[in-house]
């Protein structure tokens, strides 16, 4: 039985998974232990922890009501990380996947849960050396969380296109805007929330999955959007880790605007038909980004992802005004109109330099030093 811990509606938090690279050829390096040990000597009070393999580290923000404060906290967390990384001659970088690392060289971080995941999923755990941003949105109760999770599913392609930052993987151009999510797809408990309509229905589903021995906790679900009952949030999990500090905040603002629209609007029926085109739309966003096509099963309509995002952002103007994030809405709108995302920036840079090593060096400079945008 899962209890949903109520939280203040529309509060925000984000988690970012970061690459740890050496400063010789900018390949991944097993630096998380040394980095965490050195950071642990500071009384910083931030949420900084290991991830599933040793070339990764995760940071998380506190709870925020406004994105400006979130950006300030992310900047302070970065300062702690950069001091330690400089001391150890390590680099840190954003992006959804390291462009040329080889999964077989990655080592599982020696934490009980990660070792269990590795034992269960074998090489999939090593291949899970990919980097994402998770966005948490506060909900007052479990019923609202289920409703919001289903509501947000409609807009998942937007988050993918805006954040896409993994065009290169294992040394090749994947032709995808976001290749990271293909690594998630391999897990049997990935995908979408079941079509339950309230918290009681979700509890019944969860208990049954526990009884069957399929899951032990909510962490075993790798869904694109999932309730996080212990936090009192709904969590969006499809975004690649951005290259800079501003983009995570813009994505969080978009989630907050959508969540406010959902909570302010009347109840909308939840039907399995809403998910008929989900996988197709998700693929379009991963493969083509803003140039993808979005299908709407309700009217059999088809529209470009870019136009759908622009229409949605325009509609959200009242929500942005109420939340004090009109500047963020305008920046998102400008990016959508320009079809500008990290994958496009990464490809442009690689076309100029022809070096994936140099690409990661530039990614690290952007994240660690606020270097000029790629």
Curated annotation (Swiss-Prot):
Per the record, the GO terms for biological process are: modified amino acid biosynthetic process
Taxonomically, the superkingdom here is: Bacteria
Listed under catalytic activity are: L-cysteine + L-glutamate + ATP = gamma-L-glutamyl-L-cysteine + ADP + phosphate + H(+)
Which Pfam families does its entry note? Answer: GCS2 (PF04107)
Q: What does the UniProt keyword field contain?
A: ATP-binding, Ligase, Nucleotide-binding
User: Which EC class is the enzyme in?
Assistant: ligase
A single GO molecular function, which one? ATP binding
Known InterPro entries for this protein?
GCL_type2/YbdK_subfam, GCS2, Gln_synth/guanido_kin_cat_dom, YbdK
Q: Please indicate if the UniProt record lists Protein biosynthesis as a keyword.
A: no
Q: What is its EC number?
A: 6.3.2.2
Keyword field contains ATP-binding: yes
PANTHER family assigned = GLUTAMATE--CYSTEINE LIGASE 2-RELATED
* Family indicated by similarity: Belongs to the glutamate--cysteine ligase type 2 family. YbdK subfamily.
Q: So what does this one do?
A: ATP-dependent carboxylate-amine ligase which exhibits weak glutamate--cysteine ligase activity.
Q: What is this protein identified as?
A: Putative glutamate--cysteine ligase 2
